[in-house]
């Protein structure tokens, strides 16, 4: 009968209960609230009460979480939230399929894997294409996953070096006007890249390869006039490049190289009337076969759940605030 309550059962191994259930059963409570079911745990057996569709979705979701837990994953609230969004689309099995895509381990032995469909598509694009643009809000893993792919290619001797770069003009500051030598000037801008490499490679391995010139972390301006062969190159914060800077960077690419360009169009530090090189490149290059584009969204945020809510709130606010821009003239071939 339509709307009738059914009862389903599933088992959770005793050694995985705390991981799957969450602290104070927060994961189960979240599943209950979202899918409108009741979950009762007794001696490792879960009794799920709800409508036929909701109870079935809850059972599939919990079974997927158990599979993830058995593979050594720590189940987080973000995992559960994402699993619930997939359950709403009747795509529960996608979560464990994504989890099969192993990239590498951190120095502490933690596996690095894509955690969402958007991240999986991004990683697949990196494997297939010579140049990939990964664009999306903070917390979507676009830079970290690119770093993990770079380290994997380096370890597998697919490339002979890793080059990481960022535009060094952010928040209105120019390197030439900052005190100190080059290293002290660029460190604040490049620190996030160092931190990610330390976590993946370990400080000792990073320092050794840096000393040998096999890893280079430098401002974007230092790419000018070079040809970058047999390298895995990551340009981070590309929304802060000008069209000329990004064109300069992309034309440095040599044989045997792979390039990842990451950026967040909502966090530009360019002067108000400046055109972002990232925006221009995504329009100009979209029809070239060996260039991939991956647009990550708030659904792909894998930091604290609050970050996802912040991103969504700002997106909604900016859509309301965005004025109609009058047509402008052209300078240097780019619309201003």
What do these predicted regions represent?
Residues 2-19:
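Short glycine-/aliphatic-rich beta-strand segments at the starts of folded cytosolic domains
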Residues 3, 21-24, 41:
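A positional/architectural concept
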Residues 20, 27, 58-61, 246-249:
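Hydrophobic side chains in well-ordered alpha-helices
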Residues 29, 35-38, 44:
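Compact, well-ordered interaction domains used in eukaryotic information-processing assemblies
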Residues 107-119, 125-235, 239-336:
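Conserved helicase motor core of SF1/SF2 NTP-dependent helicases
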Residues 89-117:
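Conserved loop-to-helix interface motifs that mediate assembly, gating, or partner/ligand docking
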Residues 40-99:
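Interdomain "pre-motor" coupling segment immediately N-terminal to P-loop NTPase/helicase cores
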Residues 15-33:
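Short amphipathic alpha-helix segments
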């Amino acid at each position: 009968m339509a709307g009738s309550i059914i009862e389903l059962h599933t088992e959770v191994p005793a050694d995985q209960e705390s991981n799957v259930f969450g602290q104070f059963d927060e994961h189960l409570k979240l599943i209950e609230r979202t899918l409108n079911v009741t979950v009762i745990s007794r001696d490792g057996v879960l009794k799920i009460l709800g409508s036929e569709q909701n109870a079935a979705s809850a059972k599939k979701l919990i079974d997927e979480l158990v599979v993830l837990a058995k593979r050594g994953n720590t189940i987080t609230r973000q995992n559960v939230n994402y699993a619930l969004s997939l359950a709403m689309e009747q795509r529960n099995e996608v979560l464990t399929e994504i989890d099969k895509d192993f990239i590498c381990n951190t120095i502490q032995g933690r596996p690095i894997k894509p955690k969402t469909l958007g991240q999986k598509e991004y990683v697949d694009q990196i494997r297939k294409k010579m140049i990939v643009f990964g664009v999306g809000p903070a917390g979507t893993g676009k830079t970290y996953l690119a770093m993990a792919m770079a380290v994997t290619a380096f370890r597998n001797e697919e490339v002979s070096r890793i080059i990481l770069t960022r535009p060094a003009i952010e928040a209105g500051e120019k390197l030439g006007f900052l005190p100190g030598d080059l290293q002290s000037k660029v460190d604040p801008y490049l620190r996030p890249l160092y931190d990610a490499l330390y976590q993946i490679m370990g400080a000792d391995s990073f320092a050794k390869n840096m000393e040998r010139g096999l890893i280079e972390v430098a401002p974007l301006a230092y790419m000018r006039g070079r040809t970058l062969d047999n390298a895995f190159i990551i340009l981070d914060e590309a929304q802060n490049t000008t069209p000329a800077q990004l064109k300069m960077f992309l034309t440095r690419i040599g044989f045997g190289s792979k390039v990842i360009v990451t950026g967040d169009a909502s966090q530009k530090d360019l002067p108000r009337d400046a055109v972002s090189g990232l925006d221009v490149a995504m329009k100009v290059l979209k029809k070239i076969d060996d260039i991939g584009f991956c647009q990550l969204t708030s659904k792909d945020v894998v930091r604290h759940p609050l970050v996802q809510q912040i991103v969504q709130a700002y997106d909604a606010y900016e859509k309301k605030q965005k004025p109609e821009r009058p047509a402008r003239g052209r300078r240097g071939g780019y619309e201003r």
